[in-house]
């Protein structure tokens, strides 16, 4: 894994969120990739499950998304990537400010495993 692979997939991932583009998010993942949206939430395995999650949650409940990735890192053994990110959005009509980090495993230029850890501040 190389740093530029992580940065490129993060650009595409952020664009997919901002454009709410299911095809683009699926293009970030291998066909059997795992998307763990949060450590305590259900994991989505493969394009079919990821697409269903996006259609039922992201497209339905989330609007006005602005995504920015920050620093990216690679583990010493080169097998795991990490990426910081920030996001603002409207989720079910409420303004959110989010900050998080992703743990990534890659196969080529696609994500084979992604686990996000994030925190949300909701405007009142």
Where are the model-predicted features located?
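A short gly/proline-enriched turn/hairpin at secondary-structure junctions
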Residues: 34-45, 58-62
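Alpha-helix C-capping/helix-to-loop hinge sites
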Residues: 13-16, 36, 89
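Residues in well-ordered alpha-helical elements
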Residues: 23, 47-48
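A beta-strand edge to alpha-helix "cap/lid" segment located at domain peripheries
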Residues: 2-5, 51-124
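Structural motif
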Residues: 32-34, 110
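Short, low-complexity N-terminal intrinsically disordered segments enriched in polar/charged residues
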Residues: 1-31
